[in-house]
Structures are given as structure tokens and as C-alpha cells.
């Protein structure tokens, strides 16, 4: 785990650029990026590939990028692209919708129907992983604010990037992006409206965690009625394989043994143990 190696970065970039060059000429391009890629060569790998693609295709080609909600959206990405959209659900269930909307904005730009202008607000703000669920407050409120801004005349897209908090890069953190139709002042107002509300909720965005001991004790006290509905599930947010961790943490098992909790099942990555089975 860790940054993408220089060798892997150069290979991926060369393949992407080769395909762009071979398949052109282009009226527009859609880039399905994550937005938080970090390599030993480029701390902002997504921004860099956008820049290199722009250099290759020129200023007249409309470039759109659809990003993951955990993107650490950089000013470089916004500067090099004409349109950027971000997933607005966590867990991510609107990937298709956001990609379609990005494609629609790119197509309308090519046709001359709109003139997208973007503004990225990036206050010094980080949302704890425990508070990133978009069905729960305070993220649910921030999404309502963003959607209200999107409904204003002249707005083409307004949304939030939660950021990837485990990346040690300057771009790490929450971002607030707005796209207007040819109005840079409006784009800034839209993005700032969401960013300002997030700043007001900065304490709530930090969330509160439960210790391993407390979680196990609460789970161990589950009633027979509760257990009849299914097992108690504990999520170790510090070893989330969906976020790039190795999945080999034994802290929960150690604490379960210390407390005498029985009937615990945990998935672990341990190649040596697996080889002995």
C-alpha cells in the first residue's frame, strides 16, 4: 500500500496518452477519474493526467471529468477540464447519473448551447470518515444546501467533494464545486454558499468514534430478540479494505478475547495462516 510507483505511473500515463492520440481527433473527452490518486512522481496524479491530456488535444477540445466523492479535488483538475462532476452519494450509488450529467454538459458545450464556468472552494476543512455517510447528518444537510444552489437560474452543477482524509498531500480535504453558464461570479457564489455552511458545521463534521471495548460490550449485550434478526456487525473504520488498507488488523479479536466475547467471526488477510489451512 502507499503511493503509486513511478514505474506504474509512467506506464499508466503512457497508455492513456497513447490511446487518446491514436483515437483522435476529438470534439470532446470524458475522463472517469477517482480524484485522489497519489504517486511517487506526482502528488496530484489526477490533475497531472488532465494537464497532459490537455497539452495533447489542445484548448479547443472539451474535456469532462467525473470524480469519486472521496476525490481531493485540486485547482489543477478544474483548470485543465471544462466540466467536472463528483459523485454525491456515499456509499456511491449515483456513479452512472453523475457520469451521464457530465457527458450531457460536455455535449451541450460542444454544440455551443452552454459556456460552463467552474469555481472550486477549498476551505481548510476535513470531514471525519465517520461523518461521511450522505444519508446521515450533517452531510445530508450539506447536500440539501448544494441541491438548493443547483436549482438557481444559471447553475449547471453544484456539489461536494468529501476528500480522501488518509492522503498526505496539499490538496487533501473537502471541496465545493459549482458550474455556472458563463457567469464566474455566480459560480463562486454557489460554491461559497455550500462551503460556508460546511464551515459552520465543522464541529459536527468531526463525528465521534466508539472504542473497540465499548463496541464489543454493547454487541455482547444484544438481546435474543435482536440476535434473532441477524448478527451484530462491527465495522473497523481503521482497517477498511475499501479505502486501501491491508485488512489484517487483529485489534478487535484481541479485545474480544480479553473480554471473553464468544461467537466472533472476522475476515483477515494473512497469507501465512491461509497457506497452513
Where are these regions (language model features)?
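Active-site histidine-anchored catalytic micro-motif
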Residues: 2-13, 21-111, 231-253, 257, ...
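Core alpha/beta catalytic barrel or barrel-like domain that forms the active/cofactor pocket
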Residues: 31-34, 70, 117-120, 161-162, ...
Amino acid at each position: 500500500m502507499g503511493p503509486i510507483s513511478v514505474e506504474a505511473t509512467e506506464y499508466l500515463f503512457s497508455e492513456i496518452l497513447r490511446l487518446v492520440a491514436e483515437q483522435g481527433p476529438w470534439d470532446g473527452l470524458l475522463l472517469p477519474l477517482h480524484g485522489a490518486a497519489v504517486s511517487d512522481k506526482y502528488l496530484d496524479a489526477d490533475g497531472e493526467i488532465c494537464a497532459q491530456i490537455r497539452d495533447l488535444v489542445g484548448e479547443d477540445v472539451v474535456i469532462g471529468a467525473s470524480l469519486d466523492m472521496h476525490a481531493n479535488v485540486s485547482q489543477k483538475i478544474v483548470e485543465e477540464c471544462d466540466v467536472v462532476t463528483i459523485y454525491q452519494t456515499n456509499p456511491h450509488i449515483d456513479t452512472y447519473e453523475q457520469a451521464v450529467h457530465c457527458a450531457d454538459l460536455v455535449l451541450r458545450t460542444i454544440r455551443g448551447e452552454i459556456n460552463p464556468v467552474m469555481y472550486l472552494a477549498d476551505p481548510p476543512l476535513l470531514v471525519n470518515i465517520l461523518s461521511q455517510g450522505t444519508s446521515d447528518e450533517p452531510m445530508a444537510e450539506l447536500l440539501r444546501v448544494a441541491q438548493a444552489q443547483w436549482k438557481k437560474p444559471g447553475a449547471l452543477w453544484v456539489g461536494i467533494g468529501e476528500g480522501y482524509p488518509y492522503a498526505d498531500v496539499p490538496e487533501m480535504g473537502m471541496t465545493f464545486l459549482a458550474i455556472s453558464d458563463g457567469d464566474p461570479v455566480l459560480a463562486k457564489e454557489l460554491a461559497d454558499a455550500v462551503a460556508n455552511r460546511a464551515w459552520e458545521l465543522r464541529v459536527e463534521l468531526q463525528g465521534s468514534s466508539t472504542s473497540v471495548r465499548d463496541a464489543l460490550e454493547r454487541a455482547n449485550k444484544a438481546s435474543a430478540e435482536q440476535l434473532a434478526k441477524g448478527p451484530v456487525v462491527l465495522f473497523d473504520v481503521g482497517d477498511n479494505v475499501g479505502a486501501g488498507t491491508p485488512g489484517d488488523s487483529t485489534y478487535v479479536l484481541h479485545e474480544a478475547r480479553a473480554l471473553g466475547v464468544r461467537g466472533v467471526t472476522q475476515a483477515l488477510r494473512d497469507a501465512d495462516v491461509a497457506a497452513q489451512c
